[in-house]
Amino acid sequence: MSEEFKIEIVNPEKSFLSKEDVTEVVVPAFEGEMGILKDHISIISFLKPGIIKIFSKSGEDNYYVEDGIVEFKNNNLSVLTSSIFNIKDIDKDKISELLTQAEENSKNSDITDQNKYLVDQKIDVLKTLN
């Protein structure tokens, strides 16, 4: 019996990724890192800044996301996000640029506690990539 399921990641520009041989996905949900396997209970969750890890027979792929929504239903995982990058395609200059921007946003005196939390999460993740 196959232990694979389908994932589709969509951003505003295009269908970013569609894969049918996925064996596990780990997403940075607000509730914490969430591992999803075939036949997982149906879920809908918000994403926080972090790394989506996709495992398949061909290996592991990692993607940086800043936000989004994840839905798993009937062995189909859908991710809607406004910003996603394949980690192997991000150069150090882009990471530094995103980190500088996040650190500047963090210093804004008008930032809400919720936005401060998200910016701090983004900074932590970007520092691990840098």
UniProtKB/Swiss-Prot annotation:
Produces ATP from ADP in the presence of a proton gradient across the membrane. The gene is atpC. NCBIfam families: ATP_synt_epsi. The keyword Electron transport does not apply. InterPro entries: ATP_synth_F1_dsu/esu, ATP_synth_F1_dsu/esu_N, ATPsynth_dsu/esu_N. It comes from the Bacteria. Pfam families: ATP-synt_DE_N. Gene3D superfamilies: F0F1 ATP synthase delta/epsilon subunit, N-terminal. Belongs to the ATPase epsilon chain family. One of its GO terms (molecular function) is ATP binding. GO terms for cellular component: plasma membrane; proton-transporting ATP synthase complex. This is ATP synthase epsilon chain. F-type ATPases have 2 components, CF(1) - the catalytic core - and CF(0) - the membrane proton channel. CF(1) has five subunits: alpha(3), beta(3), gamma(1), delta(1), epsilon(1). CF(0) has three main subunits: a, b and c. It comes from Pelagibacter ubique (strain HTCC1062). Keywords: ATP synthesis, Cell inner membrane, Cell membrane, CF(1), Hydrogen ion transport, Ion transport, Membrane, Transport. It is found in: Cell inner membrane. Its main location: membrane. It is a peripheral membrane protein.
